Amino acid sequence: MVEKVYNMTYSDKRTVEMLISDENVHYLHMIFNKGEGLPEHFSNSNVYMTVLKGILSIALNEQIIHEYEQGSVLKIPFKTKMNVGNKHDEILELIVVKAPAPVK
């Protein structure tokens, strides 16, 4: 096989999984229930977030929280302060792509 296949977790439980981590890209899958999310942090690359399910609540730098529904794709610049979470009853499911891959 030329391709390499990766499998995402399908769950109702909090999930943060790195599916692909190579020299080109980091490709993550995340699932958050109401009140869950990531600790506040700064983006370590350009970040592309796709909302697969639910409503994303996100504050960037000093902005107020903005909300994005299923089907939204966000492009977030390198070194942006991020506060990512789910403030709604419906499960939030995201794909996060970091490109280029962050340098350690």
Which role does the model predict for each range below?
Residues 63-78:
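Short acidic-glycine-tyrosine-enriched beta hairpin
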Residues 78-102:
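Ligand-binding loop in jelly-roll beta-barrel domains
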Residues 26-43:
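Conserved short histidine dyad/triad with adjacent acidic residue
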Residues 1-26:
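A short, N-terminal "cap"/entry segment at the start of jelly-roll beta-barrel domains
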Residues 29, 39, 48, 64-65:
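Short, surface-exposed secondary-structure edge patches
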Residues 45-56, 61:
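Glycine- and acidic-residue-biased ligand/ion/polar-headgroup-sensing regions
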